């Protein structure tokens, strides 16, 4: 056998310990981790199929049911970010040829439409300008025209800062034999949502926003109507990894002995459990109130600086992610860079249809405090003094 030699030397960078900066993350996510969640990341590993792990998973299911306000048995966490939860929903609910109605008033509706197209669904996007929302009348007209099996709406559109009203949409969809799928990645814990009472058939969210857990896990729940559609599929879902019937088993949702499907992110699940425990300790209503009050404080401080909010109707503003019109004679990148380099605070620019139009400020979970707002206002005041472009 021919001898072999190493062609790649040990990287010098990996001889040094990892060192990361301490920053205040006031962008649209991820968010800073509270001490209890941070400590969960340092717990010792256990097996992903140990009884103790199943107990943690069962507690997470209860936490999701509380956060979503649902009694759905088919409730679980997905091993992946919010995008993974979106694809889990669509891969299991849609089959080729199904009509899919999509609220596309920001990047998340655009993404949902693209995934639907990849599945082979007949996608009907309801395209609206960024900053807009959907009314019951608008949606009913499209339901009557296209007769979809599924409607997608984004509750908290973090690319535009819009909070989509949800009351009445579940009942409307069911009247037209359509299921309602809602993205609450940016809104969960920060704005009221009632899955069962609002007739939402599939609701998903992410770990790294107002829940203040690391990215990498997402939350999802299915109504009995949605479960029936999934279990009556004529074709297998495109993804084995995201097959809900298989995920239901490892999460103890089907009443059968749990079997191996994939290796779940044990430490990430520990962190998610602790983040949900913190939400339970605080209480949903207090969390919603705190986000609302701190967002109002942010609006006042921004207006004192002469900045304009992108979403004009206060009732439609997402309290967790605020969009601010980039002022004339400024480049958004300059403001973002100045605030980061001089104050160690992250904010971001727009995304998708709001790119180059807005700055985005996140007040997520433990980061939603008046003190953080005041600290950011100081940073923005200085940035506006130093970043103006010449009008010549």
From Swiss-Prot:
Its job: Peroxisomal aminotransferase that catalyzes the transamination of glyoxylate to glycine and contributes to the glyoxylate detoxification. Also catalyzes the transamination between L-serine and pyruvate and contributes to gluconeogenesis from the L-serine metabolism.
Upper taxonomic lineage: Eukaryota, Metazoa, Chordata, Craniata, Vertebrata
Localization in the cell: Peroxisome
Catalytically driven reaction(s): L-serine + pyruvate = 3-hydroxypyruvate + L-alanine; glyoxylate + L-alanine = glycine + pyruvate
Cofactor(s), by name: pyridoxal 5'-phosphate
Annotated positions of the N6-(pyridoxal phosphate)lysine modification: 209
Record organism: Oryctolagus cuniculus
Keywords of this entry: Acetylation, Aminotransferase, Peroxisome, Pyridoxal phosphate, Transferase
Name of this protein: Alanine--glyoxylate aminotransferase
Residue ranges annotated as motif Microbody targeting signal: 390-392
